[in-house]
Amino acid sequence: MTQRSRKAKLFRLIGSMCIGGAVFFAGVIINRLWISNYFSDRAAEKAREELLTSWNRPTGTTVPFLSSASTIAPGEIGPINAPTNQEAFALLYIPRIGNEVWATPIFEGVQSKQLNSGIGHYPQSQIPGEEGNFSLFGHRNSHGQPFINIQDLQVDDEVIVETKNFWFVYSLKHDKIVRPSATWVTGLNRLPELELTEDDPFKVITLVTCEPRHSTDKRWVWWGVLQAVYPHSTPPPALVKPNN
C-alpha cells in the first residue's frame, strides 16, 4: 500500500468518524428535546386535571359552549386568594397559538420545577384581578415549549386566564426584545403603547420567554391590558364554538 493510499484511507476513516459523531449528537439532541417535551406535557396534563378537579370542574381542555356570555365589572370581583408556592392556580389560553397554549397550567414560581410543567408566575408580581402586573414566563424550546411560537402573536390578540371563579381577558398591545437583566419588564410601568390613561386601572399581563428560540441570550416580552372579566359560568366568546 502506497503512502498516498494510506493517507486517503485515514482521511476516509476520520471523515466517517466525524459524520458518525455528528449523527450521534444530533440524535441525542433530538431525543432530549422529544423526551423533555413528552414528560413536560404529561406533567402539565396531570396538573391541569388536578386543578380542575379541585375546582369541581369537568377535566379536559374543552370549554362548554353557551349561547351568550356576560361580563362583570372588575369592582365585583371579590378577594382572590394568593397562590400557594409552586402550585398550579390558573390556566392560560392564547387562541392565536392555541396548539401550544390551551388550558396550560400556571404555577406559582419560575424555577425549573414549575417551568417544566407549564408556565410560571413571577412571585413578586400581582395576580389576576389585582391592580398591577400579572407576569408570566414560559419556555420557548424544550420542556413543553408553550411559547415556541411567540413570534406569531399580534397586537390585539387575546390572552385569557381561567381561575376558579373568573375568566380574565387581556388584549396584547406591545412587544419588545430585551436583555435578561431587564427586570423592569415585570414592574408597574405605564408604557405609552399600552394606551392607558391616568384614570385607567393598571391591570396588565406580561408574557416573557427566551429569544432567539435556541438561546437564552435575550428575552421576548409581550404586554397586554385587561379588557374584560367573565364569571366562570359564562366563558368568553373567544374560547367557545357552537356544537355541530
Feature locations, PLM:
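Juxtamembrane low-complexity tails/linkers enriched in Ser/Thr-Pro and polybasic
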Residues: 1-5
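Solvent-exposed, non-transmembrane regions of membrane-associated and secreted proteins
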Residues: 6-244
